[in-house]
């Protein structure tokens, strides 16, 4: 049986076709070419506002469910970053003229919210190893796209670094410390009977829902 790190690398290899679609997504390319109307930037803000708020609650729910201290520490450690991102997202909303009543009234698209709904399912029904694997496989493409989106918003739409800090918080490669903590959580899960098929399924579905997120944002942004 493969260890945690080896298994994660295998899963990443298996999901390379989806990874490639994420890293060459038409929404990100459209932003870089200034093809998304400025008023339509509200779509990604509205969708992310719902997603991050949901993810915060999902991660907190997983913390409460964790029986092993190592898993609990790992998920607890993700909360400050998510909370900081939620605050930074409000700065972006303000820069675009979107206030709190607008954010609360925003009507999400089903495609863009599939990701957050599956994270909530993982938090309540899956093992810590499944959720950690899914997040670890997902983060590289998400981070790469965030880096490009933040840069495009500054270069093509004139937004400041402060306004685009939400995307900068997620940009760049996954920290090695995060990878090591995931490996330990996955190793614990494998040791306690979590099957490799369960880990593969969680990662495959979350990565597919990530692609649906970008598809939904693009469709809603270009329909306006």
Regions found by a protein language model. Name each.
Residues 172-203, 215:
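Long amphipathic all-alpha helical oligomerization modules
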Residues 27-33, 188-192:
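Short, charged/polar, low-complexity loop and linker segments
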Residues 1-27, 106, 110, 175-180:
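Acidic, low-complexity proline/glycine-rich segments
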């Amino acid at each position: 049986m493969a260890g945690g790190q080896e298994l994660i690398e295998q899963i990443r290899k298996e999901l390379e076709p989806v990874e490639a679609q994420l890293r060459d997504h038409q929404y990100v390319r459209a932003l870089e070419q200034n093809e998304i109307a400025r008023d339509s930037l509200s779509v990604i803000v509205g969708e992310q506002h719902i997603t991050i708020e949901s993810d915060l609650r999902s991660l907190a729910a997983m913390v409460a469910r964790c029986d092993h201290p190592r898993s609990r520490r790992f998920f607890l450690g993700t909360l400050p970053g998510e909370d900081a991102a939620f605050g930074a997202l409000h700065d972006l909303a303000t820069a675009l003229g979107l206030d709190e009543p607008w954010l609360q009234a925003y009507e999400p698209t089903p495609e863009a919210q599939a990701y957050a709904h599956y994270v909530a399912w993982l938090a309540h029904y899956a093992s810590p190893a499944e959720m950690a694997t899914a997040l670890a496989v997902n983060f590289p493409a998400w981070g790469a796209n965030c880096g490009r989106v933040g840069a495009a918003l500054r270069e093509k739409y004139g937004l400041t670094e402060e306004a685009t800090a939400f995307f900068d918080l997620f940009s760049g490669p996954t920290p090695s410390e995060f990878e090591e903590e995931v490996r330990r959580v996955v190793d614990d899960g494998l040791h306690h009977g979590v099957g490799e098929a369960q880990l593969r399924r969680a990662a495959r579905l979350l990565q597919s829902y990530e692609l649906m997120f970008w598809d939904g944002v693009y469709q809603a942004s270009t329909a306006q």
